[in-house]
């Protein structure tokens, strides 16, 4: 199994680089180059290709092997980074992002989204059912480490590395990963698709995908299982900021602490699944723990506004609030790994010619569910007030626990 997990770890690590690059490193580079905050924010439009993953997933299924797609897309990402290294960085006084840089960053997102589709399809084909738990732990942890390296470690190198040097370093990393994808023995042993399965019936593609056992239920679950959690994780740190917690302290707990706890939770999820814990009972237990954690966090939100409540340094309330952030990220990482294992198990039931499309559908719905409440939570808090908003988030977190009672046998 190690021969499979090590190359997957390397590939998922580089898959996380574009997210870290554009969420952590790029905004600082653009701002340091003199762009306004508005212009820096508008650069997020370049994420658009990620919303279209499902459009080219059938192409990955129909043309060539997933290994070939991973190799080509990863090498292409290295080429784009090499071209970016040859362009001057945004300079002071520029009205916006230079067109050439913006175009290459758009290509970077396109290649990264295509690599995401192909790599998930590769993992679905490569891993045996007993390997899904450790495999999904590798997926989640390596991706988060890659994002942290691009958004944090490279950011720390800014004083000594120039724009060209940073992107040349990224290009070399991608080319090494492409060589790994092509040469890894475990990936070379993947069976080729039979010619009859090379091209799915595109006219009925969605119907064929939804006909895979357990797909409709799994789609509903992945769309809703993070609603309450994402809303709370977006709002709670801001409420703590409003009540006197400093931005640096909040950054430490909700940044470094959150990543460490999330990785620990993901690792525990993979360990429990590797020890042959049943997926559905484990998921039910974790969701109940998460619901209890959110209930405690909701109680803290109510207590913050009571007369005499103090968030001064050293108080029990302050410590409880900061620890609740870490607890929710730990449980969030745990539930993510278990859920991704269920998604991959469901996609393995699809014909090989549909697996990339099938998993991309589930992954897109999972992302949509996370973005939905993360985006709307602020508006709900402003419109309803923090107390009713957190009660609503608590109800939304209870829904997946009840929804598990309808789980099909394929999710057991």
Curated annotation (Swiss-Prot):
Membrane spanning stretches: 10-30, 40-60, 73-93, 94-114, 138-158, 166-186, 209-229, 250-270, 291-311, 321-341, 361-381, 384-404
Superkingdom: Eukaryota
Gene3D superfamilies, per the entry: MFS general substrate transporter like domains
GO MF, one example: transmembrane transporter activity
Location(s), subcellular: Membrane
Membrane topology note: Multi-pass membrane protein
Chief subcellular location: membrane
CC annotations in GO: membrane
Keywords: Membrane, Transmembrane, Transmembrane helix, Transport
InterPro entries noted in UniProt: AmpG_permease/AT-1 (IPR004752), MFS (IPR011701), MFS_trans_sf (IPR036259)
Keyword set includes Lipoprotein: no
UniProt record similarity statement: Belongs to the major facilitator superfamily.
Protein name: Major facilitator superfamily domain-containing protein 3
Gene: MFSD3
């Amino acid at each position: 199994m190690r021969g499979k997990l090590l190359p997957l770890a390397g590939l998922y690590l580089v898959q996380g680089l574009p997210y870290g690059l554009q969420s952590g490193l790029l905004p600082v580079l653009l701002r340091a180059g003199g762009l306004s905050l508005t212009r820096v924010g508008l650069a997020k439009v370049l994420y658009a290709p990620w919303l279209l993953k499902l459009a080219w997933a059938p192409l990955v299924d129909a043309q060539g092997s997933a290994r070939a797609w991973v190799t080509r897309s990863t090498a292409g990402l290295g080429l784009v980074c090499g071209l970016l290294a040859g362009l001057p960085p945004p300079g002071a006084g520029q009205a916006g992002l230079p067109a050439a840089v913006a175009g290459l960053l758009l290509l970077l997102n396109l290649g990264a989204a295509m690599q995401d589709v192909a790599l998930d399809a590769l993992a679905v084909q490569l891993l045996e059912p007993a390997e899904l738990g450790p495999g999904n732990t590798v997926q989640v942890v390596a991706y988060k480490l890659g994002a942290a390296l691009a958004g944090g470690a490279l950011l720390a190198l800014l004083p000594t590395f120039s724009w060209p040097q940073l992107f040349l370093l990224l290009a070399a990393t991608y080319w090494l990963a492409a060589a790994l994808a092509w040469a890894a023995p475990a990936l070379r042993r993947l069976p080729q698709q039979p010619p009859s399965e090379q091209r799915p019936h595109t006219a009925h593609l969605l119907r064929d995908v939804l006909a895979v056992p357990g797909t409709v239920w799994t789609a509903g679950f992945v769309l809703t299982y993070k609603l309450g959690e994402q809303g709370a994780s977006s709002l709670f740190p801001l409420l703590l900021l409003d009540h006197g917690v400093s931005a640096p302290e909040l950054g430490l707990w909700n940044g470094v602490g959150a990543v460490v706890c999330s990785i620990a939770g993901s690792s525990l999820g993979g360990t429990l699944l590797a020890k042959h814990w049943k997926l559905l009972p484990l998921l039910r237990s974790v969701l109940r723990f998460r619901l209890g954690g959110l209930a405690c966090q909701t109680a803290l939100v109510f207590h913050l506004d009571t007369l005499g409540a103090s968030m001064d340094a050293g108080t029990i309330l302050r410590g409880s609030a900061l620890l609740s952030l870490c607890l929710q990220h730990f449980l969030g990482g745990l539930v993510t790994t278990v859920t991704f294992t269920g998604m991959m198990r469901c996609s393995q039931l699809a014909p090989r010619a549909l697996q990339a499309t099938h998993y991309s559908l589930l992954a897109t719905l999972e992302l949509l569910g996370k973005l939905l409440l993360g985006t709307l939570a602020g508006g709900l808090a402003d419109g309803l007030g923090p107390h009713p908003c957190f009660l609503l988030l608590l109800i939304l977190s209870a829904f997946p626990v009840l929804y598990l009672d309808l789980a099909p046998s394929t999710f057991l």
